[in-house]
């Protein structure tokens, strides 16, 4: 059994989701939102770092799966998002986790079946796949979807002997 931590990074709200990958599929472990408040950016990044580290220490995942930065219309927002991602990745690396990164369209494709799915479609499929009875918060459901994406990607690579391969530009490199 493998525990996967999915992170949907944000400078104000960072979603997290932990799933257990078993021979029968994935099971829900935990999810939630890290709310950083309205303080200066460096203080909010510290909250992301410490909170992600605490989630890791509480649940013991072996892998962090995180969404890649997309090109936002607002450059300032994209930079803050990138810094929040960095804080989460450093927390994971400090705790010895491997890190996997996925684009938003890869996550949507893996969970919903189409890269153009909206947040509500992702949320409903997360509920269905993990057999949840209540809707998780949007940021938490996105994080669970990122974790599910990693689990599905790993399952599809194992039969082909490509688990250790590196993904660059949409291609797998051995």
Curated annotation (Swiss-Prot):
Coiled coil: none annotated. GO terms for molecular function: crossover junction DNA endonuclease activity; DNA binding; magnesium ion binding. Its main location: cytoplasm. One of its GO terms (cellular component) is Holliday junction resolvase complex. InterPro entries: RNaseH-like_sf, RNaseH_sf, X-over_junc_endoDNase_Mg_BS, X-over_junc_endoDNase_RuvC. SUPFAM superfamilies: Ribonuclease H-like. Binds 2 Mg(2+) ion per subunit. Its EC number is 3.1.21.10. It is found in: Cytoplasm. Its cofactor is Mg(2+). Mg(2+) 1 binds at residues 8, 139. It catalyses: Endonucleolytic cleavage at a junction such as a reciprocal single-stranded crossover between two homologous DNA duplexes (Holliday junction). The active site is at residues 8, 67, 139. Keywords: Cytoplasm, DNA damage, DNA recombination, DNA repair, DNA-binding, Endonuclease, Hydrolase, Magnesium, Metal-binding, Nuclease. Disulfide bonds: none annotated. GO terms for biological process: DNA recombination; DNA repair. Homodimer which binds Holliday junction (HJ) DNA. The HJ becomes 2-fold symmetrical on binding to RuvC with unstacked arms; it has a different conformation from HJ DNA in complex with RuvA. In the full resolvosome a probable DNA-RuvA(4)-RuvB(12)-RuvC(2) complex forms which resolves the HJ. Belongs to the RuvC family. This is Crossover junction endodeoxyribonuclease RuvC. It comes from Pseudomonas paraeruginosa (strain DSM 24068 / PA7) (Pseudomonas aeruginosa (strain PA7)). The gene is ruvC.
């Amino acid at each position: 059994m493998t525990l996967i931590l999915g992170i949907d990074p944000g400078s104000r709200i960072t979603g997290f989701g932990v799933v257990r990958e078993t021979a029968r599929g994935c099971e829900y472990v935990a999810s939630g939102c890290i709310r950083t408040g309205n303080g200066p950016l460096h203080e909010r990044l510290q909250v992301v770092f410490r909170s992600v580290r605490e989630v890791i220490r509480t649940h013991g995942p072996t892998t962090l799966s995180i969404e890649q930065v997309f090109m936002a219309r607002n450059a300032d927002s994209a930079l803050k998002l990138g810094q929040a991602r960095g804080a989460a990745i450093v927390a994971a690396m400090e705790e010895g986790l491997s890190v996997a990164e996925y684009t938003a369209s890869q996550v949507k494709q893996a969970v919903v079946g189409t890269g153009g799915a909206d947040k509500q479609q992702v949320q409903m499929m997360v509920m269905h796949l993990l057999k949840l009875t209540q809707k998780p918060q949007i940021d938490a459901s996105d994080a669970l979807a990122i974790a599910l994406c990693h689990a599905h990607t790993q399952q599809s690579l194992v039969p082909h002997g490509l688990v250790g391969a590196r993904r660059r530009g949409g291609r797998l490199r051995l």
